[in-house]
Regions:
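Glycine- and aspartate-rich repeat motifs characteristic of hemolysin/RTX-like Ca2+-binding segments
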Residues: 98, 287, 371
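Beta-strand cores of secreted/periplasmic/IMS beta-sandwich domains, seen most often
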Residues: 88-91, 286, 385
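Acidic-residue sensor for enzyme active/binding pockets
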Residues: 71, 235, 286, 353, ...
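Transmembrane beta-barrel wall of Gram-negative outer-membrane proteins
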Residues: 277-288
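Glycine- and acidic/polar-rich repeat regions and solenoidal domains
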Residues: 74, 81-83, 241-244, 265-278, ...
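Active-site neighborhoods of metal-dependent hydrolases
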Residues: 321
Length: 603
């Protein structure tokens, strides 16, 4: 019998699959006991993962012992089926880190040769902070194999469509334009990511910064507290990726309990992650971590819509993983063009379950429109369940971009979002999506932008919004906005009506406004409303109606069983929500079973 959490909104079970491989070949890698002349046996292991790659054919498991592996793993074989997979995993109970970073062992000198003030300033020759201590050094050219992240800009350098302009020209303001022009490489001093600046003189404004010269080799650095280089451990991203198949379309790869760190990759498109499926399908990724990606944490699709492929797609399971400190997006994917028009292509059967997304999307370039802790395009028959998202810098928590169908978003916790849309964002879809049993707390507006919503959609229909908790949203708790889209964005030749935003038994409080619906054809009942900071907190886009609960009920028949309530809450260390409704208190473990705990409120 299928577990109820794997039932899709249309009532069918999710296409769940597992690794049933009986691994006949097992290879071992060990930094402590391995050697470059090893044979990969348990007694004579390899020193590097790369040594195991040529032998890792279908039916092979590569067991990696504890250590820090400074390499990119590039498999040359995929698996054939659930019974013939290729697996890379950490040895049981051991910590394995695969990193794109190298330790800097070069020589520092006093920095010189660059103007210390902005170019137009006359008669001032020192930094704004004259006490600033700036040093210069050069990376080892031999550390960069194939690409040098410090020699490439963030970008993106590809057009989204086949066209004349790459998306870097979406940069709306000076902040955006500086960000896209920065280099992809990152520096880490004593484990802390340093801030890169575009101009040398900016080193004199703040410590813990660095500047890269045009050669991508020479760098100038100001250590924290204007300290000297001695006594610090400095790491630099010599590689973009941690795990990236040598060829496209590999399937049935299993990754387990591996940590990938410090990838100096670029901004999408292309969506090329520190872990990349490289257009593959049927990957099982469990218990893995991606920490510190300059651009993309992991990609599970075809990277950009300019690709053309009729190869299989989707069917990825991402379970119990963590994606943290990723600059643009933690986990993302999209379909490719094929013999079907691009907008009618789909990404089928994706499961993202029990994952953590912490402090992502720190690059302030939201107009790129690919920014989220988790973002997918054209997702079908998929589950996004029981994930924990906290700290989203300039983005949404979960963003499903256009023509999604039969999607369940359930049991997710989303905290502390700053963005143009909301904690959960659904876009341009006219078929069934269910948003149920989620908690969104503290959603704020990106500076000079819209946003600050809990659950947000635009240009959609047929979204079921059920038993969610939305608190402390700077704009709306729940908003389903509607407006016309161009004809070319009509999936399967059909536009969007803005109907059927069925909204039941949600708890919304401490927001400017409570609920907005696209048009009037909806079913709405049983919602519990609390504090709102603006009048007429219940609204409809077209025809426009701004209402209180009394007239919401009277004129539209909404929320016959809904009510206003005295609601207060306390968020304790982002782990517990103490929610009080009309004097009754509920202690919700934000790391526990969210659906069951919310159902208790309505029991």
């Amino acid at each position: 019998m299928v577990d109820s959490k794997y039932i899709l909104p249309n009532g069918n079970p999710y296409d769940l699959w597992e690794d049933h491989t009986q691994y006949k070949t097992v290879l071992y890698v060990s930094q402590k006991n391995g050697s470059l002349t090893g044979d990969g046996s348990e007694k004579n292991p390899f020193l590097t993962i790369a040594q195991a790659v040529p032998l890792a054919k279908p039916g092979t498991k590569v067991i990696i012992h504890e250590g820090i592996y400074r390499e990119t793993v590039r498999p040359i074989y995929g698996g054939n089926s659930e019974t013939e997979m290729v697996m890379f995993c950490a040895a049981e109970g051991e910590q394995v880190e695969i990193t794109g970073a190298e330790i800097f062992n070069g020589t520092f000198r006093d920095s010189e040769g660059w103007k210390k003030q902005e170019g137009s300033i006359r008669n001032r020759y020192d930094f704004d902070q004259p006490e600033a201590k700036v040093y210069a050094a050069k990376f080892d050219r031999n550390a960069f194999i194939g690409t040098n992240p410090f020699g490439a800009i963030n970008g993106p350098v590809l057009p989204w469509w086949n066209g004349p302009v790459p998306k870097l020209f979406n940069a709306k303001n000076e902040t955006n334009r500086q960000i896209v022009s920065l280099r992809r490489g990152m520096l880490f001093c004593d484990g802390e990511r340093m801030e890169q600046v575009l101009n040398y003189y900016q080193l004199g404004e703040k410590d813990n910064r660095f500047f890269i010269e045009d050669d991508g080799i020479t760098f100038h650095i100001r250590f924290k507290g204007d300290s000297a280089p001695e006594g610090h451990t400095l790491e630099y991203t010599a590689r973009e990726y941690g795990f990236y198949p040598e060829e496209k379309y590999f399937a049935y790869i299993h990754l387990q309990n591996l940590t990938f760190t410090k990838g100096g990759n670029g901004f999408p498109p292309p969506q090329a992650g520190v872990i990349s499926t490289n257009c593959g399908h049927h990957w099982l990724v469990e218990g893995c971590k991606v920490l510190y990606a300059n651009g993309v944490g992991m990609d599970i699709g075809f990277q950009c819509p300019n690709r053309f492929s009729t190869e299989p797609r989707g069917h990825h399971i991402i379970r119990g993983c963590e994606f943290s400190y990723c600059g643009i997006v933690g986990l993302t994917g999209m379909p490719a063009n094929s013999e079907t028009f691009y907008l009618d292509n789909i990404m089928p059967s994706i499961l993202v379950e029990d994952c953590r997304f912490i402090d992502n999307c720190y690059h302030n370039f939201e107009s790129l429109c690919e920014n989220a802790a988790f973002k997918m395009h054209r997702l079908h028959d998929s589950l996004i369940i029981n994930n924990y998202i906290s700290g989203v810098g300039y983005a949404s928590g979960i963003w499903l971009d256009s023509f999604n169908e039969n999607i369940l978003i359930e049991g997710n916790v989303i905290l502390h979002v700053v963005g143009t849309y909301g904690g959960i964002f659904l876009e341009a879809s006219n078929d069934l999506q269910t948003v149920r049993h989620n908690i969104v707390i503290d959603s704020r507006i990106n500076t000079n932008e819209n946003g600050g919503n809990g659950i947000y959609s635009h240009t959609c229909e047929d979204i079921k919004t059920i038993r969610n908790i939305c608190l402390e949203c700077e704009k709306y708790g729940i908003v389903h906005h509607w407006h016309d889209l161009p004809e070319w964005r009509s999936p399967g030749g059909s536009g969007f009506c803005g109907f059927n935003f069925d909204t039941f038994e949600n708890i919304v409080s401490h927001c400017d406004y409570l609920v907005m619906l696209g048009r009037e054809k909806n079913e709405v009942d049983g919602n519990i409303y609390g504090v709102h900071r603006q009048p007429a907190p219940l609204r409809i886009v077209q025809p426009r109606a701004w209402l209180d609960l009394k007239h919401w009920q009277k004129n539209y028949g909404y929320d016959v069983n809904g009510r206003m309530a005295d609601i207060s809450y306390e968020l304790q260390e982002d782990k517990r929500l103490i929610l009080t409704i009309d004097g009754k208190t509920f202690d919700i473990d934000l790391l526990g079973n969210i659906p069951a705990q919310i159902d208790q409120i309505f029991a």
